[in-house]
Amino acid sequence: MQLADLSNLAAKLDGVTERRRDGLLDWRYRGRRVARQLDGSHIVIRSSFDSRDFLVRSFPETFSVPRRFAKHMMIVADLENGNAEAIEDAVIGAWELQSGK
């Protein structure tokens, strides 16, 4: 999965805006973070704790929770080596979480 794929997905999610902050992409729903770019191959995605645990167990090659995100409702996705469908589903889940859909 590429960052351009995420931009295309975000454009299809009602109310999600994309912008750059310090050169990195950031996607928000009414000001609430859905996901943001960490570097060229990783993004962090908003996620409930239950969903985060499920994703890490189900797709360990795709998702991780570094220590700095352990107390936060966030999960890191590996765009280069991860499962593109799982990442897409996680981003849609983040939008649903933030939008209440």
Residue ranges and their predicted role:
Residues 1-101:
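Charge-dense, helix-prone N-terminal extensions
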